[in-house]
Amino acid sequence: MTAWRNLASWLRQQELEAVLVTGRTNVRYFSGFAGSAGVLAVSGDVRKIFVDFRYVEQAEQTAPEFEVVRCQGNPLDAAADFLQQQAWRSIGFEEEILTVAEFSRLQAKVTADRWRPVRLEPLRTVKTAAEIENIVAAAVIADTALTNLLPMIRPGATEIELAAALEYEMRKLGSEKPAFETILASGPRSALPHGSASGKKLDAGDFVVIDFGATFSGYRSDMTRTVCVGTASAR
């Protein structure tokens, strides 16, 4: 795991002594932990992940380079308690992730003059070879799943049945979950932007728009295809 090392180097460049990582995507990226409740505190020589009792084992397994701190309550509050005890004068926080209420709770324990708003997404922009492999794997899963779905696209099938079948095919091929809500709309509904699958049955000659993606090791694919039910009319 080199991501946290890049983060520690970035802290020095930004003249920050530490950073509080709260966004789920960033928590996973920098630590490997993919649970729904976890917060990181990182400095040059500190790497802590705060989780509640449900996620201790998962954090120990997936974030081995972080010290796992079991919290009795909210991980954010536990992290704030820890930061309150440190002498750090400049601490980064994800201003686009935290709510006003959450930041108010942080300021109640760590004075406002010690906080610095940051965005961590630029650190993820340039992908490593391993990340690219994961993205390719997600795309291959989605492409193969669509190939498996094509024989099912016929008159009488409903949009929602086909969307479910496509997601099932992706799961069988190793997708963690859909990359986003699967869009599958046919006939006149295919003109809808981001049209959710409905109970509409496909008719012969319908065009079917499918916008979907797979997730592999946290990395997602996104592809859109249009197919015709049977033979398209001259129009």
Regions found by a protein language model. Name each.
Residues 1-235:
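Active-site neighborhoods and metal-handling regions in enzymes and metal-associated proteins
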